Amino acid sequence: MSKISSDQVRSIVSQLFKEAQESKRGFLETVELQINLKNYDTKKDKRFSGQIKIGTVTKPKLSVCVFADQQHCDEATKIGAEFMDIEALKKIGPKNKKAIKKLSKKYDAFLASESILRQVPKLLGPGLNKVGKFPTLLTHSEDMASKINDVKSTVKFQLKKVLCLAVAVGHIELTEREVATNIIQSINFLVSLLKKGWQNIKTLYVKTSMGPSHRVY
């Protein structure tokens, strides 16, 4: 049972859009959902992790890199996607923590060809997994551009050591209805991941990149 109404969320989103239009900043503002949890012990309780694909791109400028086999290297070149082949990954190596950290900061998400995905732990160690950026499988039957778009439309929740999370759920070039739908879908999915559902949620806020926070719950 959801504890927030769609009317309430739409009204808040309307306010966000109004503020963003009045301020007219020189870049595309992202809409962010900020979550504070309670009654959760990150040392004892299982740290949840999950992702949901929503109806629109949440962050158009989200950067994606493909760990590509030869066929995917050719496809990435054709569509202008960023990629690294197996030789480039071997050059980094699993012990070069500094380079792996730099790679994980440079890109928001990773895709990998099947033959390379299996080797990622051996090639790069556990670094990408630790920061919640382990690559998603890209098969040869999938269209690379569509798959990259799917990644840009995915909201990921991963609890680390602190009881607060922030995720992008849209941007101000979407319609108000689209952003409101994304927020509701994301919240309901998050609740399904939590041990005690709504009882684990302390507060929920939404805000644009530079705007004030608005409390949803």
Curated annotation (Swiss-Prot):
GO terms for biological process: translation. The modification N6-methyllysine is found at K122. The modification N6,N6-dimethyllysine is found at K122. GO terms for molecular function: RNA binding; structural constituent of ribosome. The keyword Repeat does not apply. GO terms for cellular component: cytosolic large ribosomal subunit. SUPFAM superfamilies: Ribosomal protein L1. Keywords: Methylation, Ribonucleoprotein, Ribosomal protein. The keyword Isomerase does not apply. Pfam families: Ribosomal_L1. Belongs to the universal ribosomal protein uL1 family. This is Large ribosomal subunit protein uL1. It comes from Dictyostelium discoideum (Social amoeba). The lineage of its organism: Eukaryota, Amoebozoa, Evosea, Eumycetozoa, Dictyostelia. The gene is rpl10a.
